């Protein structure tokens, strides 16, 4: 009997990395792979809280496991320190991860590990693969332009379209497979595949969003979410809160529990009275489904790559407020190259927020950007269809790397 290939996936411990890794895992599972999805212990415990024990137990051939990261224990419902995680990835994670792979290889419940797929920021996974004589294939979860920027860190890309960036990367290293948007490829996972309905979220998702959206006029709602990491000063948070409250449009605002606790002085009873009946504040939601809802007309985002892809797939225009990493590059593409949005200034005020929302939802220029967003949606869908560039690259990845 042929042994299933066994892929061990190791995402960076942040929500924006966990989601695309799960999408890739499901795609590989649909192609006959046994999957082991590896979290650090902190996030494994958070998944227990948000998704329950049945989810974490996984499926017979799709397992969720954990290993210690060497960081101090914490009960906070928030992403760990990026500095601490980056340091641990360099200094303390290799040994425990190597031991985990050895246990997987010795287990009678799974085939031997045939490949390790670490996040681009979890390079110890490649070191472990090299030491154990196993195929190592890093997965970069952000944009091609972001990858290019990191690849040549001091040479920032200022000109060119995404395709030119991809061509430049492949000229340097031909073994780059551009398989996004994974959201659309994932939709092709067969209905009978047992992993199809798996989702991963470190926060409990609020189900009220869709009932509330169903009551709103099409294209009227501003959806606001700054991702799993971004933090604001109380002054910034106050400007956002009152800018949204006075913009004249209904809005859904995702405010993580850690951000909500830090800004209790802003989200007062008086504030909730001000926005009553025309706004919904939640701690987390199913973003892809919210963006796809006809009630949403505008996305106010930090321009993380997952959010960038999800808004393109939904065909929705944006206001960008980039925070870290390559988010400014993503914002530049969204606003300057693809022309589907505008960027807020770093020290944005409530008045600017009101002006930008009105420009995007009430002006002719806003309508033009909305039409552009629909054009980019069509291009994304075409890339993921049979014969499209992403579909073909995923087939090449399976044939040339994992089946080689």
List each model region and its residues.
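Glycosyltransferase specificity loop/lid
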Residues: 1-404
């Amino acid at each position: 009997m042929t042994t299933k290939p066994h892929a061990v996936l190791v995402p960076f411990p942040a929500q924006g990395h966990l989601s695309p890794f799960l999408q890739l895992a499901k795609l590989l599972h649909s192609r006959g792979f046994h999957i082991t999805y590896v979290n650090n212990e902190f996030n494994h415990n958070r998944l227990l809280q948000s998704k329950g024990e049945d989810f974490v137990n996984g499926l017979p051939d799709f397992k969720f496991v954990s290993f210690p990261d060497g960081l101090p224990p914490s009960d906070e419902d928030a992403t760990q320190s990026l500095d601490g995680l980056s340091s641990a990835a360099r200094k303390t994670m290799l040994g425990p991860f190597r031991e985990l792979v050895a246990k997987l290889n010795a287990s009678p419940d799974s085939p031997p590990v045939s490949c390790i797929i670490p996040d681009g920021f979890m390079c110890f996974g490649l070191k472990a693969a090299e030491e154990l004589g196993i195929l190592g294939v890093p997965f970069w979860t952000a944009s091609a332009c972001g990858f290019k920027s990191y690849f040549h860190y001091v040479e920032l890309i200022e000109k060119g379209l995404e395709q030119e960036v991809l061509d430049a990367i492949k000229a340097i290293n031909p073994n780059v497979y551009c398989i996004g948007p994974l959201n659309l490829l994932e939709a092709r996972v067969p209905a009978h595949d047992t992993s199809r309905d798996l989702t991963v979220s470190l926060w409990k998702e609020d189900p009220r969003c869709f009932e509330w959206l169903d009551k709103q006029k099409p294209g009227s709602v501003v959806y606001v979410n700054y991702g799993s990491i971004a933090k604001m000063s109380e002054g910034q948070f106050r400007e956002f809160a009152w800018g949204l409250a006075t913009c004249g449009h209904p809005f859904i605002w995702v405010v993580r529990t850690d951000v909500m606790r830090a800004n209790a002085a802003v989200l007062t009873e008086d504030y909730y009275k001000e926005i009553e009946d025309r706004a919904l504040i939640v701690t987390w939601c199913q973003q892809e489904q919210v963006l796809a809802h006809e009630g949403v007309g505008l996305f106010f985002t930090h321009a993380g790559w997952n959010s960038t892809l999800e808004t393109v797939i939904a065909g929705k225009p944006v206001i960008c407020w980039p925070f870290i990493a390559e988010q400014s590059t993503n914002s530049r593409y969204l606003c300057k190259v693809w022309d589907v949005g505008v960027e807020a200034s770093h020290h944005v005020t409530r008045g600017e927020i009101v002006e930008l929302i009105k420009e995007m939802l009430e002006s002719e220029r806003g309508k033009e950007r909305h039409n552009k967003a629909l054009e980019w949606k069509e291009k994304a869908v075409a890339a993921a269809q049979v014969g499209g560039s992403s579909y073909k690259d995923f087939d090449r990845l399976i044939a040339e790397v994992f089946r080689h």
